[in-house]
Swiss-Prot record:
Pfam families: Ribosomal_S9. Residues 1-28, 142-161 are annotated as: Disordered. The lineage of its organism: Bacteria, Bacillati, Actinomycetota, Actinomycetes, Micrococcales. This is Small ribosomal subunit protein uS9. GO terms for cellular component: cytoplasm; small ribosomal subunit. Belongs to the universal ribosomal protein uS9 family. InterPro entries: Ribosomal_Su5_D2-typ_SF, Ribosomal_uS9, Ribosomal_uS9_bac/plastid, Ribosomal_uS9_CS, Ribsml_uS5_D2-typ_fold_subgr. It comes from the Bacteria. Keywords: Ribonucleoprotein, Ribosomal protein.
Amino acid sequence: MAQISDSLDVAPESFSTETPNEEAPKAPRAVLNVSGGAVGRRKQATARVRLVPGSGSITVNGREFADYFPNKLHQQLVNDPFKVLDLLGSYDVVARISGGGPSGQAGALRLGIARALNEIDEENNRAVLKKNGFLSRDARVKERKKAGLKKARKAPQFSKR
């Protein structure tokens, strides 16, 4: 029976438990001259979004992005689909948003941007956007007020006697 040490002619220089990453060749990215549009909704807000190849400027209801969403958290939320696809600064966004508050509007804009990016290049973008949850509509909305209650669930004080 052969010894293990006999089978090695030269000792290896370094040992590694990792296997080399052999990623499947990706389909070439679509040329960034294709525009797309979509609608996103969140809570009571609706965003109609248009993506046009450009410098990365975002215009919401005719106002600059930073003016419309001064909260950095909302700005980050809206830019997330571009970040995960490495397309930050590749498209100009023109959006019309109606209804809801700042948080709902930011969520609606994010969904609209993600759907538009999906429409532009479904082969390359869909899997990444879906994995990060950007193509899912958040169905949570305000619960309706019920008769006999003060709010959706808040009841008037109850007295046993």
